[in-house]
Amino acid sequence: MSQNTKHHRVTNYRRRDLRNTLESRLGLPVEKRRLVPQLFRLKITNIGLDVSDYTILDIIKEFGEPEYINFRDHKDSRSCISDFKDNEIATKLIEKYNNFEINGKSIQVTLLDQQKRKRDADQERRKLRHGPRGGYGSHYTKSQKPIEQRNKTVDELNAELDAYMKES
């Protein structure tokens, strides 16, 4: 049975004991977070259709080995996306090859903002999930939800717990 049918939705279930801890409210400590190495993404555009992948690959590898590379064909030109571990490699490549002419066409080399791209992808995912007319519905009204919710500190949570225990 397919999990992505229209009427059947599978959600990720978290155990109640894991869900209701202070750690889940305050967020994970910095030491426990998984660190993802930042990659610097370059976009090379306006590549002529007669320029081979190997020519562009040689230009890129002149400065260092890319972590990722992808070529795309468009109607009247081509583009290339490549990721580097080191920002220096990316900036050197931009300095040397931005507005560089290959086979009569001037290529453009730009550094892409990965954080903006991630935010845009998250927004698109939300739109797909909730559709053009909103979410799946809720028995809560919008006015019941706080407008801005900040994470409480451990001291604030302890004071709240003490006040609750004194009431009963």
Swiss-Prot record:
Residues in RRM domain copies: 40-114
Protein name in the entry: RNA annealing protein YRA2
InterPro entries: Nucleotide-bd_a/b_plait_sf, RBD_domain_sf, RRM_dom, Yra2_RRM
Function as written in the Swiss-Prot or TrEMBL entry: Involved in export of poly(A) mRNAs from the nucleus. Recruited to the coding sequences as well as poly-A sites of active genes.
Native source species: Candida glabrata (strain ATCC 2001 / BCRC 20586 / JCM 3761 / NBRC 0622 / NRRL Y-65 / CBS 138)
Any single Gene Ontology cellular-component annotation: nucleus
Region (Disordered), start-end ranges: 113-152
Subunit structure: Associates with mRNPs.
Family membership: Belongs to the YRA1 family.
